[in-house]
Amino acid sequence: HYSYTEHYYIGDIFVYTSPDEEKGVLLELKGKGCRQFESYLLAQERSWYDFLMDALVDGGVMKRLDLAINDHTGMLDIPELTEKCRNEECVSVFRSFKSYASGELVKHEEQDKAGMGYTLYIGSLKSEVYFCVYEKSYEQYIKLGIPIEEAPIKNRFEIRLKNERAYYAVRDLLTYYDAERTAFSIINRYVRFVDKEADKKRSDWKLSVRWAWFIGENREPLKLTTKPEPYTL
């Protein structure tokens, strides 16, 4: 895996090693792995900020970082956002978007085969930064059998960063200790959703009300949350 020769794991926390010292040691944490890793951070009285700082001080290299924003109220309507992309009501430096009624068509990119419901990718999956917005409630229904209307998280907006982009996001997190600032400054740099106004230039179209709410207008600030979970054998 990743051309490493050995790997060790406990729960969903994976460590890859190689006799080639140039490659170093790779720590891989997916969603569940992050929750389990937080149990160790909690026991050590450390935060994610402490861990990331220690990793950088020791010469760590960030290969990938995902920042996820959970929508608990359904403010993100993914079919509506997809329609806005088609109607040129998505103002973005990205040149591409893709939408799927389920995760089937991109299962080589996703761990979860068909369990993502409506999914919208903004940006190229090959680039160092792109966004993935999907119906988390549908995923929870497929995986855990939780009825869609009872799911605590309706949608998830993921910022996926690789290499240099991941490094600069970590640097921003460690400069401001404000995950909301870091996440939304990235989103606002790359994309905004607007409402078409026939008598105005596209650059002057107003932000969509729902999108304005999502990015911070008239809502409570967000914080970097931790939800430590023990691993199960």
Ranges and model annotations:
Residues 1-231:
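Structured, helix-rich domain cores that form ligand/interaction pockets
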